[in-house]
Amino acid sequence: GSEMCIRDSNGYITEKKFDIETMSGTIHVECLNSRATEFKVNIGKPSFISSDIPVSGEVREVIKENFVFHGKEYKATCLTVGNPHCIIFTDNVSAEAVKNLGPYVENTDEFPERMNLQICRQVDKGNLEIQIWERGSGYTKASGTGSCAAAAAAYKLGLVESRINVNQPGGMIQIDMEEDGTIYMTGTVGYIADISVAESFFS
């Protein structure tokens, strides 16, 4: 689920460039404006290799592979961008659809560490529309790594160019795919609520 909750933390930091240590490694972040509301994040390189994701079975790239979820067959592409994602391309991209399918994808035996799901529609060569089911959290209106995973899968399949706008209920994120495979995510942060955090949280 949340090994790489980068966008949630960025609104608290005002340095121009900085690193964030996550459960999946060090993430390099650049603040793009003086108000600290827009950030560019180096997510690293995705892997479609089953043992990296992980997906059970022989070691292979999990590209447009047939899976059965809740008695129905789907073609899915799976990858990791620091956490595991299953991408299903469909014309029916709705909250209801991902809520109905998400629990079955998350908990299938073929995904030993459970799985995040994005159902995705190619709008054109530069735009995708997604809905998100996050393992351990359920329906989610926005996900940075989910957007990166959907864009990387679409790019791998030749559906999009190297710059992709990923549209989700919580807003749009711009994804840039570099020639060496590195993913850059550019997005904004906004005020949601005031919270209190114990000092021990940071120790």
Where are these predicted regions, by residue range?
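Short, small-residue-biased leader/transition segments that mark boundaries at the very start
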Residues: 1-6
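Active-site proximal loop and beta-alpha junction motif in alpha/beta enzyme cores
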Residues: 7-141, 152-203
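Helical hairpin unit composed of two closely spaced alpha helices linked by a short loop
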Residues: 145-147
